[in-house]
Amino acid sequence: MRLIPLRNTAEVGKWAARHIVNRINAFKPTAERPFILGLPTGGTPMEAYKHLIAMHKAGEVSFKHVVTFNMDEYVGLPKEHPESYYTFMHTNFFDHVDIPAENINLLNGNAADIDAECRRYEEKIKSYGKIHLFMGGVGVDGHIAFNEPASSLASRTRIKTLTQETRIANSRFFGGDANLVPKYALTVGVGTLLDAEEVMILVTGHGKAQALQAAVEGSINHMWTISCLQLHAKAIMVCDEPSTMELKVKTVKYFRELEAENVKDL
């Protein structure tokens, strides 16, 4: 596992965006051989999306031959709802870059047959072979996507019940009322994420410090689903200074020295 210790949220977003652009450009995608990118929603990746849009407008990257798969979607929320992840992605990213509409894959939380929708999504991912890079965030309780504590580490795309803690955390997008946050969501599984060639998790804020500590220094534990990334051959944690507060000083020092050449010019 790599840990990229940076100073603040802005640097986390910039580093993550630069890493994605480097990966896409090194891959040299074509229509017949697209780059497959997994994407999250929420507050944490906002800076990364801003930088990706800026780099696209500067001519540094094209998303014409990029295929995306989003991590999750609320169940029962109309896709036109301002807080649906469909709306979030189009407002904050897709509408500002050159990605073709047919290359965008989002879970349908209003599907008549939820189980069939989850199977369809898994099969669509498999049809491309694998996701080359999956960017994500982490919850206060260590959840990745909507894989809440006690999720199976072998799980696939499915419906999940959201914990009260997650609904309270997401209530900031619903006028502060947790009762307006849907109780269920469709989410890629832990196993789905582990199948990706590379997984990059963005961690910002003191509130995520315990989750980061569990991911990096703790044991693999289904109560901290983020810890599953210790099993991944190519996992990266990109974090700001407040989120490292629960890590041992020597852990942060070790990774800071190890990644010194990779955090220049931020």
Curated annotation (Swiss-Prot):
Pfam families: Glucosamine_iso
One Gene Ontology biological process: N-acetylneuraminate catabolic process
Active-site residues annotated for this sequence: D72, D141, H143, E148
E.C. designation(s): 3.5.99.6
Keyword set includes Hydrolase: yes
Keywords for the protein's UniProt record, in alphabetical order: Allosteric enzyme, Carbohydrate metabolism, Hydrolase
InterPro entries: Glc/Gal-6P_isomerase (IPR006148), Glucosamine6P_isomerase (IPR004547), Glucosamine6P_isomerase_CS (IPR018321), NagB/RpiA_transferase-like (IPR037171)
Signal peptide: none
Key word Transferase present: no
Gene3D superfamilies per the UniProt record, alphabetical: 3.40.50.1360
Catalytic activity: alpha-D-glucosamine 6-phosphate + H2O = beta-D-fructose 6-phosphate + NH4(+)
Role of this protein: Catalyzes the reversible isomerization-deamination of glucosamine 6-phosphate (GlcN6P) to form fructose 6-phosphate (Fru6P) and ammonium ion.
UniProt lineage: Bacteria, Pseudomonadati, Pseudomonadota, Gammaproteobacteria, Enterobacterales
Protein name according to UniProt: Glucosamine-6-phosphate deaminase
Family named by the database record: Belongs to the glucosamine/galactosamine-6-phosphate isomerase family. NagB subfamily.
Organism: Yersinia pseudotuberculosis serotype O:1b (strain IP 31758)
Site for Part of the allosteric site, residues: S151, R158, K160, T161, Y254
